[in-house]
Amino acid sequence: MAIQPHHQASEMEIHKAVTFMHKKDFNAAVEVLKGFEKKDKGLMARAATNLSFIYFLEGDNNSAKKYAEMAHKYDRYNAKALVNLGNVQYANGEFEKAVETFQEAAEKDSDCVEAIFNLGLAYKGMENLDEAKRCFEKLQTIMPMNAEVIYNIANLHDQMGTPATDPFPARACCH
C-alpha cells in the first residue's frame, strides 16, 4: 500500500515542527503544529502532544493541559500525551491525579520510562516512599547506569533511613 502524498506532507510538517523544537524556536513549532487542528486525528494527536510539551516547557500549564487532553481524546493509547497531562497535574501539586495519569501512561506503553520516572516523583510528592522506590528500582533494571535513577533511589533510602545497596557492585575483570 502506497503512502498518500498528503500523509507524506503531514509527516514532513511534524518533522519540521520537531526540528524547530530542537532549535528552541517554539513559536515556529507552535505555528506549524497548530496547522494540524483540522487534519487527520492521528496526526492531530501527535501535533497536540508536541504542543502540550512546548506549552509545559514555557510554563503555560493551562494550554499544556488543553493540548494533552486533546491528544488523548484523539488517540486513547497516546502514553506521551498522558505523561504531559500528568506533568501538568504534578506541577499544580495534584499528586494523586498525577499518579493515576502516570499509571495509565505506563499501562498504555510499558516501555515509557518517562511515565515510570514521573510516577516515582509523584509518589515522592505524596510521601509514599515505598511506591516511589519501587518505581525507581524498576527503572534501574531498564536503565542500570542512569544517574537520575540512582540518585532518586539513594535519596529515597536516605529519606527512609535505610542503607542502600551498592548500585555499582564490584565486577571481576580479566585479560
Predicted regions and their residues:
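Canonical positions in the second alpha-helix
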Residues: 36, 70-71, 104-105, 138-139, ...
